[in-house]
Amino acid sequence: QPKSTPTLTVFPPSSEELKENKATLVCLISNFSPSGVTVAWKANGTPITQGVDTSNPTKEGNKFMASSFLHLTSDQWRSHNSFTCQVTHEGDTVEKSLSPAECL
């Protein structure tokens, strides 16, 4: 089975959620094979380990997909310039960043 590097999409928190002082970022990891991935989140380049919830990969056709959630408060979300979802797969690292300023 050919190796396939994951595609990442990062979604910002919803405005409804921010009103409740919560912020959940979602990193969608898709189209990868084989199934082993390691997900790390960073805020302004610094690793975040708390509030991270990553699903087990599920098979979609002959590829896999997974998602990782980063649970923050709205203050944490607003107080950083960038959030990055970093995925390591078969020795390759792919990352996708999201900037709160672009989401206002």
Swiss-Prot record:
It comes from Mus musculus. GO terms for cellular component: extracellular region; plasma membrane. Signal peptide: none annotated. Coiled coil: none annotated. Residues 6-99 form the Ig-like domain. PANTHER family: IG-LIKE DOMAIN-CONTAINING PROTEIN (PTHR19944:SF98), MHC CLASS II-RELATED (PTHR19944). This is Ig lambda-2 chain C region. The gene is Iglc2. CDD domains: IgC1_L (cd07699). Disulfide bonds join 27-85. Keywords: Disulfide bond, Immunoglobulin domain.
